[in-house]
UniProtKB/Swiss-Prot annotation:
Glycosylation positions in this chain: N45, N73, N104
Keywords: Disulfide bond, Glycoprotein, Secreted, Signal
Any one GO cellular component localisation term in the record: extracellular region
Name of the protein described by the UniProt record: Evasin P1180
Predominant subcellular localization, coarse grouping: secreted
Role of this protein: Salivary chemokine-binding protein which binds to host chemokines CCL2, CCL3, CCL4, CCL8 and CCL18.
Classification via InterPro entries: EVA_Class_A
UniProt organism field: Amblyomma triste
Disulfide partners: C38-C58, C54-C95, C71-C100, C90-C109
Pfam families linked to this entry: EVA_Class_A (PF19429)
Domain of life: Eukaryota
Molecular function terms from GO: C-C chemokine binding
Length: 116
């Protein structure tokens, strides 16, 4: 009886691993190529993250985020100099033509550690 039980555990484990492999290899269905470009610097607030600014240079070419995307009104240079895991007060804004247009709201934000 113990032999039959161990076979079932091994079989279920193998099936679970196969399912995970195929589930994680699936390509995104939105048509966007996530392998191109340079990642934007993001700052967190404990529940989600937003980009620092709305544009940057990627291999000498400008990249901009879509209009009406929420952002932190902080340049990437300033965000990179922030001490990791220390809370800061950041102005919120909305991307408009590559610029984070500040509104009258602030929230706590922080730069994550490099290991994240």
């Amino acid at each position: 009886m113990a032999r039959n039980w161990s076979f079932r555990v091994i079989f279920v484990s193998a099936m679970w691993c196969a399912l995970l492999k195929f589930a994680t290899l699936e390509e995104p269905k939105d048509g966007y190529d996530y392998t191109e470009g340079c990642p934007f610097v993001v700052l967190g607030n404990g529940t989600h993250a937003k980009p620092a600014g709305c544009s940057h240079l990627c291999n000498g070419a400008p990249e901009t985020l879509d209009d009406n995307m929420e952002c932190y009104n902080v340049t990437e240079e300033v965000a990179k100099r922030m001490t990791p895991d220390i809370p800061y007060t950041c102005w919120l804004g909305w991307c408009s033509k590559g610029e984070c247009k500040r509104d009258n709201r602030t929230e706590v934000c922080y730069r994550g550690s490099e290991r994240e």
